Swiss-Prot record:
GO molecular function, one term: nickel cation binding
Subunit structure: UreD, UreF and UreG form a complex that acts as a GTP-hydrolysis-dependent molecular chaperone, activating the urease apoprotein by helping to assemble the nickel containing metallocenter of UreC. The UreE protein probably delivers the nickel.
Protein name: Urease accessory protein UreF
A Pfam family that the UniProt record links to this protein: UreF
InterPro entries named among the record's database cross-references: UreF, UreF_sf
Keywords of the record: Chaperone, Cytoplasm, Nickel insertion
Family: Belongs to the UreF family.
Protein task: Required for maturation of urease via the functional incorporation of the urease nickel metallocenter.
GO CC entries: cytoplasm
Xref: Gene3D superfamilies: Urease accessory protein UreF
Localisation: Cytoplasm
């Protein structure tokens, strides 16, 4: 079987986990005027990629994928606890939990997930997206690095979809932004791979504040 199919499946917006429902604070940034043009959108996404995802979210997800691939279940359990503790706002916690639950339901109904992974998932009190993404990669025989690349691409694609719904930003402009941001996506993956686990962490105050403000936003399209 062509291995690219599994990777495309994992990164597909058709994966039924509801990623299109969340903006991760971007809708609030548009509402308060911080993001109001392609240039400001590029700055917002670039900062999220290099200052937050590359330093924390991406290496944490990569560690989940590696532990699942190597069957290091105790390590994976510790990573799950770290992930849950790192959700700084109610919306970010619910986003990870709800998307994780949807992916868990999908995996439970598929034959590819092996018994050790099923057992781990069954005894996990609160499966989140990073865990279920790692188990999906294991089930579909996707390497940890490729699983990380798929996750980064899905994140970028979703952010651009949010912009097309909230800004005067058409599909061609979104594709131009994609071309400009792809080198940063590659840099984020490389940084996430090289980072020392002891230095894992970011201080994304702007993201946290945007997500907290989004909880009280009067009119909104997205759940975060």
């Amino acid at each position: 079987m062509n291995p690219a199919w599994a990777l495309l499946r994992l990164a597909s917006p058709q994966l039924p986990i509801g990623g299109y429902s969340y903006s991760q604070g971007l809708e609030m940034a548009v509402d308060n005027g911080r993001v109001d043009s392609p240039d400001s959108a590029r700055r917002w996404i670039s900062d999220q990629l290099l200052l937050n995802l590359a330093r924390f979210e991406a290496p944490l997800l990569l560690a989940h994928c590696q532990a699942a691939a190597d069957e290091h279940w105790d390590e994976l359990r510790k990573l799950c606890e770290s992930h849950r503790a790192s959700r700084e706002t109610r919306e970010l916690h619910l986003e990870s939990r709800q998307m994780g639950y949807s992916l868990q339901q999908l995996l439970n109904g598929l034959p590819e997930l092996d018994q050790p992974a099923r057992d781990f998932l069954e005894h996990c009190a609160e499966p989140h997206l990073a865990l279920c993404w790692a188990l999906a990669a294991r089930a579909w025989q996707i390497s940890p690095q490729d699983a990380l690349a798929a996750w980064l691409w899905s994140w970028l694609e979703n952010q651009l979809a949010v912009l097309m719904k909230t800004l005067p930003l058409g599909q061609q402009a979104a594709q131009r932004l994609t071309s400009e941001l792809l080198p940063l996506l590659q840099q984020a993956q490389q940084d996430a791979t090289r980072i020392n686990p002891e230095h894992l962490g970011s201080a994304a105050f702007g993201l946290s504040l945007a997500c907290m403000a989004h909880e009280r936003q009067y009119s909104r399209l997205f759940r975060s």
